[in-house]
């Protein structure tokens, strides 16, 4: 039996079939790859704005919410706390918040829209630890000049109750203020700018 002749029809069929299978494989591999470029539902939810009811926060107390996987400290400040903020400005590294991360619509001295409600991202600007809320005045471990604020237990940075860092601390900047807006007197939306709300 002689095999001299090439079956052109069979060759075309094999080339076409191989091309179709190869193209299907390439599309099958590309679909999950392209899909990985887009955020998952979980990632979208993590970056979504968060509504927080602040009506139950007692004066001088703090609550913690979560936004984008970060703690958000929310403090209801008293007149005494607000008065103490002015007394310690000379001890602060950036008292007018010129170098700080905060929306333009917050008052740079009290670092909030409404003086009595403070929102801060609760991550130290030094190495990312979470500062502890220390509202008491002149505790033994923080000294007689302490008027309340935040203490970072990792490396000892001190912040006042506006999130402003004291001079000569490891932390280089004030605690960040997240974008936020008021839906009502009791509901704050963290993650939505007042200017865009």
Protein language model annotation of sequence segments:
Residues 2-21:
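N-terminal secretory signal peptides and thylakoid transit peptides that target proteins
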Residues 41, 54-61, 71, 96, ...:
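Solvent-exposed, flexible loop/coil residues
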Residues 16, 26-70:
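C-terminal segment of N-terminal export signals and the immediately downstream linker at the start
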Residues 61-108:
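Extracytoplasmic/periplasmic/luminal assembly and interaction segments
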Residues 90-197:
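Rieske [2Fe-2S] iron-sulfur-binding domain
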Residues 54, 67, 75-76, 121, ...:
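Pocket-edge structural micro-motifs
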